Amino acid sequence: MADDITETSQTVAAGQLRALIERIERLEEEKKTIADDIKEVFAEAKGTGFDTKAIRTIIRLRKKDQAERQEEDAILDLYMAALGMV
């Protein structure tokens, strides 16, 4: 009886593990598809004449809140002033 419970537990654990791995694999495939889509959009932007580096910077900045951006700008200004760049 104890062997049956252990075997059942192992079967359930193996099934759960397999399901988790398959979910991760599907998500990885979706991630790859999305990355390819993003790459295509950047290629389209470049083909239209937009600067993709600037677009990436804007996207990065839009992810941050205003206070965080202001703090980074202040530090950047301070460092540039210290180096005589402004």
Curated annotation (Swiss-Prot):
Coiled-coil stretches: none
UniProt-recorded Gene Ontology molecular function terms: DNA binding
Segments crossing the lipid bilayer: none
InterPro entries with a match to the protein in the record: GapR-like, GapR-like_DNA-bd
Similarity field: Belongs to the UPF0335 family.
Cited HAMAP family: UPF0335 (MF_00797)
Protein name from the UniProt record: UPF0335 protein mll3968
Organism: Mesorhizobium japonicum (strain LMG 29417 / CECT 9101 / MAFF 303099)
